[in-house]
Amino acid sequence: MAWAAEYRGRVHLVGGYAEQQVDKPYHHAYDPGSDRWEELPQLPRGANHVGVAALGNRLYAFGGFTEQNRNPHDGVFAFEGERWHTLRRLPEACGAIACVALGDEIHLIGGAIGTDNRRSIDWHLVYNPAEDRYGRRQPMPLGRDHTGVVAVNGVVHLIAGRVDSFHTNSNLHHTYNPNTDEWTARAPIPTARSGHGTVWYRDRIFVMGGEGTNRVYGQTEAYDPVRNTWESYAPMLTPRHGMGAVTVGDAIYVAGGGPQMGGGVKSAINEAFSLA
């Protein structure tokens, strides 16, 4: 199980659970054109629930957990060309951060800190790659981790996620406007969930998968930002959580993840969704 981002026309999966370990430094890229995977230089520090985002010519990796969904680290790295570079550390060790590029910055929202006292946080940072510095912005309305995030038309959409545990999932949906430093409530997602995929595709925000109490979700729901409404689409062929979901070209690619609750069972499945 690993999170992903689109970088240079490919799906890049970073870190995750694999081979009976929870802190793999793996870095794989999938090319939809050739339907092939490539193993790339590994992360300097392995972890799960690594926050990933692409901006400009670099792929960024923020934090992550060194144990199963706990014990985070504060390392930050950027991949460019054929190697990883070490960047300024996070202000505090954190995992399961929602990361998205907007303009010349990367927004880092929510996540979880701690080990024995693991808890969700409401922080909202922006990372400036040109200066290698962090700034603080208005915190998210409710501290969560495992949320979905996407930037559309100059604002950030933050969708669902968990408060400390998947037993307390949220259906909240807010937008953040960087010009006013304010959050605004939007139509809540019909299915409260966490560990889901969230992407922008054909003028809508598509959300798929995720987990909750005693179940893994296969529902696919899409949000229309113009009408502020949600609608349902075809469910996933293989319901999963903790997968990498990325739009490349005219399709959504959903790779890896867990077909059962928790991290005990992993999947290597890669499936695509597209509209006619």
Task: Please give the residue ranges for each predicted region.
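Kelch-like beta-propeller repeat domains
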Residues: M1-A276
